[in-house]
Amino acid sequence: MSNQPDRIIIFDTTLRDGEQSPGASLTVEEKLTIARSLARLGVDIIEAGFPYASPGDFEAVQKIAQTVGTEDGPRICGLARATQKDIQTAAEAVKPAAKGRIHTFLATSDIHLQYKLKKTRQEVLAIVPDMVAYAKSLVDDVEFSPEDAGRSDPEFLYQVLERAIAAGATTINIPDTVGYTTPSEFGALIGGIKQNVPNIDQAIISVHGHNDLGLAVANFLEAVKNGARQLECTINGIGERAGNAALEELVMALHVRRQYFNPFLGRPPESTEPLTNINTKEIYRTSRLVSQLTGMMVQPNKAIVGKNAFAHESGIHQDGVLKNKLTYEIMDAESIGLTHNQIVLGKLSGRNAFRTRLKELGFELSDTEINNAFLRFKEVADKKKEITDWDLAAIVNDEMQQAPELFRLELVQVSCGDHACPTATVTLRTPDGQELTDAAIGTGPVDAVYKAINRVVQVPNELIEFSVKSVTAGIDAMGEVTIRLRYEDKIYSGYAANTDIITASARAYISALNRLYGSIQDQSATEVTKSEVAAI
């Protein structure tokens, strides 16, 4: 009996593998926000974390399972090494979900067996079915990954996969652990598994790959042609080292070129049925959300979601696009949710108009969140004559995506000029409720502000990234500031938007410091190293 779907299953691992990007650490609430966005996007499976790694990871997976893992929502997955403790913890974390999955893994390449696991092939052949069967006794849906499959002996790999499926694995995931394979090699690997594992039709073939050579998306598309039906990917392609296969690139490649891919899924070439369940109009907003919460900027020339993806500077190209978009565009910007930047509200607009427009833009906010965002909107509308959709998105993102306010910025004031020494005065409310004021001089106004804040907060850190960009055109445009701080080999991000760049810079810095300070407070929590799962 075949277990193969006639569409592609999208398995999102932004909250697990994506979070392993340096500096992409997220709070539980931020993970929940992203999970809700992924559910709106229409992903089939959310790998919400590695529950055994830390109490924070366990809490995040459990909360996502409770809140997002509804009957009509995505399947919620927890990662686990092939040990009983890991598997039991993962099962407990995903238990609240209507549809839960355990994803367990064990390396199969000789180099991993010899140097990391220190186990023989026979031992691995015994461990895999035992642990898969144990996972199956706790949940109905089990996925197994042979780590470093690309460098494993094919005959041994086939044996491992056959035993995993016989023990109850419903999905077999093939990882390109170090992003080494080429498309033809990866396609042949999947084709070999399809032909040589006797019970492979009882499981779905999944692929997971890293982008070290920039080939992850190409490898996955070749895998689809050879029988893969689940793609493990991340928003914006974030992940360990050079990242993972980018969800938006895979989905839009399958969407735009579905006539090419249809026959590989047993469909007539002319079929217009979508190949995935993804609501493509949610792609851009989800990309922005992940970028802002992780502090990882999207490069301007990034396919699909980059700032320049639908921009045409060449006069010949501009002329062609104006006459007919299809001359130089293979997809419509609106198909990924990139709307025209229309003017929608002004300072006389009321709360109902504000709420209605946010709902039209896809924001689902509580009454408290609406009230907070409306106050910010009024503040901006007093300074800026016309408020556009992009302004609204920046306002909501700024208000909703701040870290818990341990320190609160009450006042920032700067003095600078051609022949003046830049000076800043700041007032902060501390976690214990005190209001402290201090001042500092710097090489520029932002430097002076940050030095003044540091005198109050007194948490040593290194500013490693500072970026500013305008939300819209015009001299009165809002500016977005994204920063990243390093403290003891960990990186913390901050984001803020304001018509005043100095204020936005101060708020972004406080946001990052609040994450840093909160992390220091939580350092007593025991955490298992994630290095073993970094490449899965």
Curated annotation (Swiss-Prot):
It is found in: Cytoplasm. One of its GO terms (biological process) is L-leucine biosynthetic process. PROSITE patterns: AIPM_HOMOCIT_SYNTH_1, AIPM_HOMOCIT_SYNTH_2, PYR_CT. InterPro entries: 2-IPM_HCS-like, 2-isopropylmalate_synth_dimer, AIPM/Hcit_synth_CS, Aldolase_TIM, LeuA/HCS_post-cat, LeuA_allosteric_dom_sf, LeuA_bact_synth, PYR_CT. It is an enzyme of class 2 (transferase). Pathway: Amino-acid biosynthesis; L-leucine biosynthesis; L-leucine from 3-methyl-2-oxobutanoate: step 1/4. PANTHER family: 2-ISOPROPYLMALATE SYNTHASE 1, CHLOROPLASTIC-RELATED, HOMOCITRATE SYNTHASE-RELATED. This is 2-isopropylmalate synthase. It comes from Rippkaea orientalis (strain PCC 8801 / RF-1). The lineage of its organism: Bacteria, Bacillati, Cyanobacteriota, Cyanophyceae, Oscillatoriophycideae. The gene is leuA.
